[in-house]
């Protein structure tokens, strides 16, 4: 049964999506939402192929984008900061606030958060969690605004849909830019915000075309290539 179901789905994708065509952004987002077949509200993911050589240290592309329309995800935040900031961090909506006590919980396997923010004075504590946070991409970093004396703004950014990005070994940036029930216009606005920040993060050493290919998909759906002139 499983196999037939899959091929039926694949057949529908093949009928609806022309893999050789690049789509107008709004048309592409409409199509992705139409093809989302899962029972849950799927995320809309974007993959952007950059003209960089990621093996070279002067061509690393990383940063963060605040999505103007949010991501539709509930973001849980852990903040490492001293007593002076703790009350303000809790008030700003952080689920977990602490220092050595929070570090001990994380070391013990507590990972009920999606973003970690640290004030500079907490880095001695956070530094010891590198083996736990690093592999999950949760290590706070000044470049993405997650190591900052202003933890309140960082919490608000995270909660309002800040997305961190980093080009992988193949020079591709993956990011979630919303949910399938977002209007195409809102998804396009989110994507444009990401592209703007990627352009700002362009390494001086990168040669040739920087934005090579932009494709979108839902969690379980096929990839759709967007025509960049429509963005």
Curated annotation (Swiss-Prot):
Pfam families assigned: Ribosomal_L1
Protein keywords: Repressor, Ribonucleoprotein, Ribosomal protein, RNA-binding, rRNA-binding, Translation regulation, tRNA-binding
Protein name: Large ribosomal subunit protein uL1
GO biological process: regulation of translation; translation
Gene Ontology cellular-component terms listed: cytosolic large ribosomal subunit
Family: Belongs to the universal ribosomal protein uL1 family.
Function: Binds directly to 23S rRNA. The L1 stalk is quite mobile in the ribosome, and is involved in E site tRNA release.
GO molecular function annotations of the record: rRNA binding; structural constituent of ribosome; tRNA binding
UniProt-listed SUPFAM superfamilies: Ribosomal protein L1
């Amino acid at each position: 049964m499983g196999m037939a179901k899959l091929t039926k789905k694949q057949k529908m994708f093949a009928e609806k999506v022309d893999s050789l065509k690049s789509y107008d952004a709004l048309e592409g987002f409409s199509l992705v939402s139409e093809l989302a077949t899962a029972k849950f509200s799927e995320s809309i993911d974007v993959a952007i192929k950059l003209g960089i050589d990621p093996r070279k240290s002067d061509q690393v592309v990383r940063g963060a984008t605040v999505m103007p329309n949010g991501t539709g995800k509930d973001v849980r935040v852990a903040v490492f900061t001293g007593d002076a900031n703790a009350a303000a961090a809790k008030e700003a909506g952080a689920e977990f606030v602490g220092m050595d006590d929070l570090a001990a919980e994380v070391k013990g396997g507590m990972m009920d958060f999606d973003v970690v923010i640290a004030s500079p004075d907490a880095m001695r504590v956070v530094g010891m969690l590198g083996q736990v946070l690093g592999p999950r991409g949760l290590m706070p970093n000044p470049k993405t605004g997650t190591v900052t004396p202003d933890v309140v703004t960082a919490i608000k950014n995270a909660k309002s849909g800040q997305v961190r990005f980093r080009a992988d070994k193949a020079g591709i940036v993956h990011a979630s830019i919303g949910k399938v029930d977002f209007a195409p216009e809102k998804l396009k606005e989110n994507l444009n915000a990401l592209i703007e920040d990627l352009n700002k993060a362009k390494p001086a050493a990168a040669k040739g075309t920087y934005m090579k290919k932009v494709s979108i998909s839902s969690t379980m759906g096929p990839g759709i290539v967007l025509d960049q002139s429509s963005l």
